[in-house]
């Protein structure tokens, strides 16, 4: 019996919409990352992008447990000397609520060209509206 290997052209990708309102950040991010990789499908192949498209709405209403809202710090560096910037979860959720979910999911995807292709299938919106109704996304309960 031969091992099944999915062909990139033969992969069927569905569109799903996830409501992040009241959900815990890490728990929703792990399920989204798994769906983006395609691990929920029988034809999952590690070196082929078999995942689905995921639309996340209400990103501004995602929650974290404990004191992480004030204690969780996001760092970035400008590559110049002294260019280390930091921002707390509270401030980031006020300024760019989409970025909180994007960073959490991106950290759970593989590094490299395949991981970047998976990440491009993630669409995050701060409010309840999204502009992907033409794709007829199915509601995904997480």
Swiss-Prot record:
Protein's GO biological process: negative regulation of translation; translation
Keywords from the named record: Ribonucleoprotein, Ribosomal protein
Protein name: Large ribosomal subunit protein uL13
Chain's role: This protein is one of the early assembly proteins of the 50S ribosomal subunit, although it is not seen to bind rRNA by itself. It is important during the early stages of 50S assembly.
Subunit structure: Part of the 50S ribosomal subunit.
Single GO MF annotation: mRNA binding
PANTHER family assigned to the protein according to its UniProt record, in alphabetical order: LARGE RIBOSOMAL SUBUNIT PROTEIN UL13M, RIBOSOMAL PROTEIN L13
Domain of life: Bacteria
Keyword Ribonucleoprotein: yes
UniProt source species: Aliivibrio fischeri (strain ATCC 700601 / ES114)
Family: Belongs to the universal ribosomal protein uL13 family.
Gene: rplM
Keyword Ribosomal protein: yes
InterPro entries from the UniProt entry: Ribosomal_uL13, Ribosomal_uL13_bac-type, Ribosomal_uL13_CS, Ribosomal_uL13_sf
Pfam short name (any one): Ribosomal_L13
Annotated GO CC locations: cytosolic large ribosomal subunit
């Amino acid at each position: 019996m031969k091992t099944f290997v999915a062909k990139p052209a033969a992969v069927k990708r569905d569109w799903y919409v996830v409501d992040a309102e009241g959900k815990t950040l890490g728990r929703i991010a792990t399920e989204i990352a798994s769906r983006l990789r395609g691990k929920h499908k029988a034809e999952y192949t590690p070196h082929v992008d078999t995942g689905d498209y995921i639309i996340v709405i209400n990103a501004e209403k995602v929650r974290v447990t404990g004191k992480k809202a004030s204690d969780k710090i996001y760092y970035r560096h400008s590559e110049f000397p002294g260019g280390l910037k930091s921002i707390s979860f509270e401030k980031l959720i006020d300024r760019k609520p989409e970025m909180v979910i994007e960073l959490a999911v991106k950290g759970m995807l593989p590094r490299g060209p395949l991981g970047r292709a998976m990440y491009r299938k993630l669409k995050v919106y701060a409010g309840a509206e999204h502009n992907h109704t033409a794709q007829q996304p199915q509601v995904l309960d997480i």
